[in-house]
């Protein structure tokens, strides 16, 4: 498969930054190479009885969210990692920062209500490890889950998600 290249633009106080990364499909997972390291994302269906176990097994390099669009999760993760690397984070952890940016709010408890893991389709993203897709595959396997296909995101939904993730910079 030929790699696809995407640009995410983020307006931060009048400056436009472009994140160029390569997206490589592995099964239904996506591995994303960024200047902040590799990320890997997959979609799974969680039963209500497996949510707590999944959250407990999800370490500091993993986040599970109920977002509809994988592109907004990727963007929020990149912004969260960047915020931590520059000392502009609001949350105490990258996982928390991802939640805040996806939900577009400043309180973790509110973000969990809006975008936290729940019964049904969820996205799991791994970051901060040398082979995030291998870690993600092992995580999914350990829970006895099956990957679901990642479908293209609606363009308007992507824009709204990017705006929510970026608005945290201005708050």
Swiss-Prot record:
Membrane-crossing segments per the record: none
Disulfide bridge partners, by residue number: none
InterPro entries in UniProt: CGI121/TPRKB, CGI121/TPRKB_sf
Top-level taxon in the UniProt lineage: Archaea
Cellular component GO terms held in the UniProt record: cytoplasm; EKC/KEOPS complex
A Pfam family it matches: CGI-121
N-terminal signal peptide: none
Major subcellular location class: cytoplasm
Keyword vocabulary terms for this entry: Cytoplasm, tRNA processing
Alphabetical GO biological process terms: regulation of catalytic activity; tRNA threonylcarbamoyladenosine modification
Cellular location(s): Cytoplasm
Function: Component of the KEOPS complex that is required for the formation of a threonylcarbamoyl group on adenosine at position 37 (t(6)A37) in tRNAs that read codons beginning with adenine. The complex is probably involved in the transfer of the threonylcarbamoyl moiety of threonylcarbamoyl-AMP (TC-AMP) to the N6 group of A37. Cgi121 acts as an allosteric effector that regulates the t(6)A activity of the complex. Cgi121 is not required for tRNA modification.
Subunit field text: Component of the KEOPS complex that consists of Kae1, Bud32, Cgi121 and Pcc1; the whole complex dimerizes.
Family to which the UniProt record says this protein belongs: Belongs to the CGI121/TPRKB family.
Protein name listed in UniProt: KEOPS complex subunit Cgi121
Organism name: Pyrococcus abyssi (strain GE5 / Orsay)
